[in-house]
């Protein structure tokens, strides 16, 4: 997260994790109207940053955090922690995972018949890594992401259409961020 604090010629094309975490907190408290939440936190800088921002906003707006459980990236077995969360019966599970881990969490939650709503970050915004792996278990999952697929901006719409034509799948946040970075480099070269 501190990489872009290094100087005036270092840029970021996406928001910091704690900012996106606050967006998740807003989504949980205001849009999904959750009163209680369990947090599944990927144990790295990104996951920790998301969790910090989420908890900061959510608790300030009346959401009670029932549990905070960390997991290592690449974890395969989430059933024990999901069983614990099922007993707590939160209104919402906030999941900071990347695509594959997030998909496994959803599949294992479905296997345990957990009906709790799930909120994730841009880490889940991946057609191949998340949606194809999670399958039907991804139905109803809400994510916060900086890719606005409803944008009327012609650059965005052109990107969305051409990406799908080129690769045969819907674009995700990672591809969009890469495209933004490329456009920034092109603009800098022109100037």
Predicted feature descriptions by range:
Residues 40-49, 97-100, 148-149, 171-177:
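Extracytoplasmic "Venus flytrap"
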Residues 78, 89, 184-191:
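Extracellular/periplasmic bilobal clamshell ligand-binding domains
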Residues 1-68, 117-142, 150:
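Extracytoplasmic ligand/sensor domains, especially the bilobed periplasmic-binding protein
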Residues 106-179:
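Extracellular/periplasmic periplasmic-binding protein-like sensory domains
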Residues 38-41, 89-99, 105, 116-121, ...:
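Periplasmic-binding protein-like
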Residues 8-14, 83, 143-150, 167-172, ...:
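Second-shell loop/turn segments in exported
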Residues 20-23, 48, 70-84, 153-157:
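Structural motif
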Residues 1-7, 13, 71-78, 98-103:
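Beta-alpha junction/loop-to-helix N-cap segments that form part of ligand/metal-binding clefts
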